[in-house]
Amino acid sequence: VPGQIQRMIKDLTEPKMNWRELIRMNIQSIIRNDYSFMRPNRKGWHSGAILPGMKNDETIDVCVAIDMSGSIGDEDAKVFLSEIKGIMDQYQDFSINLWCFDTDIYNAQKITHDNSEDLLSYEPMGGGGTDFEANWTWMKENDVQPKKFIMFTDGYPCGGWGDPDYCDTIFVVKGNKDAEAPFGQTVIYEKEV
């Protein structure tokens, strides 16, 4: 097959979904929508019927872990924190349990709309090996049960990837295009140009 045709086939077989959009869609899926008579649906007014309207709970509640093992540099940490800020900027109200990890958990904080400026002074800690399991151990010990757990990592765990049954997980992998978690969703971080 000629080279130009091979390139076309490669382009067609390697779909690229914007990983930020994938995360946004995943977070959006956990926002509760419910019916309420507090905001009646106007569509039924002309017929004299009062129908409930949609009540949107725009608060997101997620956990985010930053891999700060020895293979992650300061620039990677800065990129990861910038992406977390980007997630916060998309929503009016949020609660993000944020921490760093290597073989242990460090600097766990809850970031909300009220203290969002704390993210600017957040200090990533770590620098040792990489134990993904430490995240699930910490969540279980601290009774943290997220609807979504987002891990920013380079995708090189020493051991297992974590507990596939505990929570819905998204692995955002930077610098390791071959990484594929055995559960959850794996998205490859690609810097947009």
Segment roles from a protein language model:
Residues N56-H113, E117, Y122, A134-T153, ...:
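Von Willebrand factor
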Residues H46-A49, N107-K110, G160:
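Short, solvent-exposed polar/charged micro-motifs at secondary-structure junctions
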Residues R42, P124-G129:
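Short, flexible loop segments at the rims of nucleotide/cofactor-binding pockets, characterized by
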Residues N97, Y156-V193:
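VWA/integrin I-like adhesion module and closely mimicked acidic/polar interface patches used
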Residues N33, Y122-E123:
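Conserved P-loop NTPase mechanochemical-coupling segment
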Residues W19, D76, G128-F132:
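Phosphate/oxyanion-binding active-site loops and adjacent basic polyanion-contact surfaces
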Residues G3-C63, I72-E75:
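Acidic, polar low-complexity linker/tail segments
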Residues V1-M8, L12-K16, M125, A134, ...:
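Metalloprotease/metallohydrolase-associated module, dominated by Zn2+-dependent proteases
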